[in-house]
Amino acid sequence: MGKYFGTDGVRGVANKELTPELAFKIGRFGGYVLTKDTDRPKVIIGRDTRISGHMLEGALVAGLLSTGAEVMRLGVISTPGVAYLTKALDAQAGVMISASHNPVQDNGIKFFGSDGFKLTDEQEAEIEALLDKEVDELPRPTGTNLGQVSDYFEGGQKYLQYIKQTVEEDFSGLHIALDCAHGATSSLAPYLFADLEADISTMGTSPNGMNINDGVGSTHPEVLAELVKEKGADIGLAFDGDGDRLIAVDEKGNIVDGDQIMFICAKYMKETGQLKHNTVVSTVMSNLGFYKALEANGITSDKTAVGDRYVMEEMKRGGYNLGGEQSGHIILLDYITTGDGMLSALQLVNIMKMTKKPLSELAGEMTKFPQLLVNVRVTDKKLALENEKIKEIIRVVEEEMNGDGRILVRPSGTEPLIRVMAEAPTQEVCDAYVHRIVEVVKAEVGAE
C-alpha cells in the first residue's frame, strides 16, 4: 500500500482527509496516467449515494477535463457496474466514488483500467509520484482541446441486462427479500429481481445521502433475517453500499456468509463442468469448515492475503474463475472483473432453482467451525511477529490442535493491532486457545 492508495483505492473522511482539492489532483493525475497514450480519452465516473459524492465527483470531473479527457457521468451505480461499463463502453478508464461498507462520513475513489480491472501497484505508484511532486508539469490543453462532460444514466440498465443473461431461467415462484443498504443497488436490485419475475420484499432502498450502511446491508444481515421470517421469503440478499458484496439469509433466517456462498457456487460449478482447474481462491480468513467441505467434494483451494485485490491477482495468475472472501466479495471472473453482489445473488438463486433445493440445504453441506477473533492493541506490530514467546505459544497451541482447528495471528493493515483468530470444533475450546495467545501478546508487546 502507498501513501494515498490503500487496498481498495484512496479512502478517507470526506472533506477532511479526502478533500475536493485532493480529488481534483487524483482526477488530473490518475486520468493522465491511465489515458496518456490516447487522444481524446474517454473516462466514466459512477458514485454511491453518500452526500459527499456530488462534491467529489465535481472535483474529479474538473481534474479529468483539465487533461483533455472526455468524461461520462453514470450517476448512482454499483462498483461492478462501473467495472463492466468501462470495458463495454470502450473507455480508457473508469472511476468509482464510494467507501463501500464504511459509514457515511467516509468516501473513496478507485480506478479501473480499460480492461475493467483495478489498477496495478505500478500504476498506483505512478499516480502517487505525481501527487507528491511540488510542481504540476502535466500538459494543460486550452480551447477546443479541453475535455467535455456528458451523462449516461442508462448505464445501470445496460449493466443489469448483461448480468441478467447469466442465469438459466426466471425466478418465478420464489419470494426474495432484498436489503440494499440505502446504497448503490437501491434502484437496481429491486428492478433486476422483479424483472426476473420473483416476488420481492425490500428494505434499505430509500437513500437520502445520510443513511448508507446505517444499520442495514451486508454488515447487518440480522435485520434482513427478521424480514425473511416475517414475509416467509425463500431467500434474503443483503448488499453493501457500493454493491460489491453479498451476504445471504436462508428461508429459516440463518445467515449465509461469503464462505458458504463460495462453497455452494464451487460445488455447482464443479458438477456442471464450469469450475476452472477445479480450484477456488479464498483468503486466510476463510473458515476451516469451508476448506473441509471443499476437500470432501474433491475441490482444491488456493489461499491469499486478506483483500479482494489479492484474490483477483491469484485468480488471474492461475487462470481460475471463482474466488472471494468470507465478507461477501465473490468474484466470478467468467462474467466480471471484480466482486459483484448482484451477480453473485443471481448465481445463488439460479443454483436454488436448478437444484430444486432450499438455501438451508445447500448451505448445510458446509459445517462452519466455531471462530473467535480478538484484536490486541500493540506498541509495535513488527516486534510482535518476531517475539519468541509469542511464536512459542502459537507453536504449542497448534500442536495441541493436532490438525483439528487452526490459529491465525496477523497484523492489521491499517491500525496498530495484532489480530488473533482461532477455529476449533467447539466454541469453548476455540475461546480458550485465543485467550492463551492474547495474554502472551499483551504481556510482551501490549499497548496501555
Curated annotation (Swiss-Prot):
UniProt cofactor note: Binds 1 Mg(2+) ion per subunit.
Gene Ontology terms, MF aspect: magnesium ion binding; phosphoglucosamine mutase activity; phosphomannomutase activity
Residues forming the catalytic site: S100
KW Glycoprotein (keyword) present: no
Cysteines engaged in disulfide bonds, as pairs: none
Domain of life: Bacteria
Cofactors, names only: Mg(2+)
The enzyme's E.C. designation: 5.4.2.10
Positions with a binding annotation for Mg(2+): S100, D240, D242, D244
UniProt keywords, alphabetically: Isomerase, Magnesium, Metal-binding, Phosphoprotein
Swiss-Prot/TrEMBL catalytic activity: alpha-D-glucosamine 1-phosphate = D-glucosamine 6-phosphate
Gene Ontology cellular component terms for the protein in this record: cytosol
Classification via InterPro entries: A-D-PHexomutase_a/b/a-I, A-D-PHexomutase_a/b/a-I/II/III, A-D-PHexomutase_a/b/a-II, A-D-PHexomutase_a/b/a-III, A-D-PHexomutase_C, A-D-PHexomutase_C_sf, A-D-PHexomutase_CS, Alpha-D-phosphohexomutase_SF
Modified residues (Phosphoserine): S100
GO biological process, one term: peptidoglycan biosynthetic process
Gene3D superfamilies: Alpha-D-Glucose-1,6-Bisphosphate, subunit A, domain 3, Alpha-D-phosphohexomutase, C-terminal domain
Pfam families for this protein: PGM_PMM_I, PGM_PMM_II, PGM_PMM_III, PGM_PMM_IV
Alphabetized HAMAP family for the sequence: GlmM_B
Reported function: Catalyzes the conversion of glucosamine-6-phosphate to glucosamine-1-phosphate.
Protein name: Phosphoglucosamine mutase
Organism whose genome encodes this protein: Bacillus anthracis
Gene label: glmM
